[in-house]
C-alpha cells in the first residue's frame, strides 16, 4: 500500500503539461517554510493500492496530451520507494510520463531503482550552503547534492528547483 495524502488533477506546476499530482505522506525534512506541512507526519494519509492510483492515472491519460503525466510529490516520495517501484513499472507500461518531486535526501538501492524508472526528477534544493540548509530543514544537504551528481552522471533528466523565500533563502552569494 502507498500512503497518500491527497491528489491534484490537472496540475500545471509539478512537471511539464497537465498532470495528476499525487502527494504522498511523510517527510524526513522539517523545512521552516514547508508548503505542505500536513504531509510531514508518516502516520497520516490514506493507505492506497497501486492499482487504484494506476486506474486514476489511466482514466486521466487523455487529458495529459503529449507532455503531461503523473507526478509524485509530498512529503517525500522516496520514503515509499519500495511500494512505488511496481506502480512506476505499470505506469510506464501504460505509456504515462512519470515525474518524481524529491528533496534527494534519501538514498538506497530502492531509491536508485525508483529514480531509474522516473522520466523526470524534480530535485528540490532547499539551500546550497550546508549550514543554512541544516537550519532550514533540520538535515544535511550532502545526500541531496550527491543525488544531483548521480542524476548528472547518469544523464538522467532532472530539473533543479530552488524556492526563493525572503528571509530564508534569498542570500546574495
Q: What spans do the regions from the language model cover?
A:
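A short linear-motif detector with a strong N-terminal bias
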Residues: 1-3, 49-51, 99-102
Amino acid at each position: 500500500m502507498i500512503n497518500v495524502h491527497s491528489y491534484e488533477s490537472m496540475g500545471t506546476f509539478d512537471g511539464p503539461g497537465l498532470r495528476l499530482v499525487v502527494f504522498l505522506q511523510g517527510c524526513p525534512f522539517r523545512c521552516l517554510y514547508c508548503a505542505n506541512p500536513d504531509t510531514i507526519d508518516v502516520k497520516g494519509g490514506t493507505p492506497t493500492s497501486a492499482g487504484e492510483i494506476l486506474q486514476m492515472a489511466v482514466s486521466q491519460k487523455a487529458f495529459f496530451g503529449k507532455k503531461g503525466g503523473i507526478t509524485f510529490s509530498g512529503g517525500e516520495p522516496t520514503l515509499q520507494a519500495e511500494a512505488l517501484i511496481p506502480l512506476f513499472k505499470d505506469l510506464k507500461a501504460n505509456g504515462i510520463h512519470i515525474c518524481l518531486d524529491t528533496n534527494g535526501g534519501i538514498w538506497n538501492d530502492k531509491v536508485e531503482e525508483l529514480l531509474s524508472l522516473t522520466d523526470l526528477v524534480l530535485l528540490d534544493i532547499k539551500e546550497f550552503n550546508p549550514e543554512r540548509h541544516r537550519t532550514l530543514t533540520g538535515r544535511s544537504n550532502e545526500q541531496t547534492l550527491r543525488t544531483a551528481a548521480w542524476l548528472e552522471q547518469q544523464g538522467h533528466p532532472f530539473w533543479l528547483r530552488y524556492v526563493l523565500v525572503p528571509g530564508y533563502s534569498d542570500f546574495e552569494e
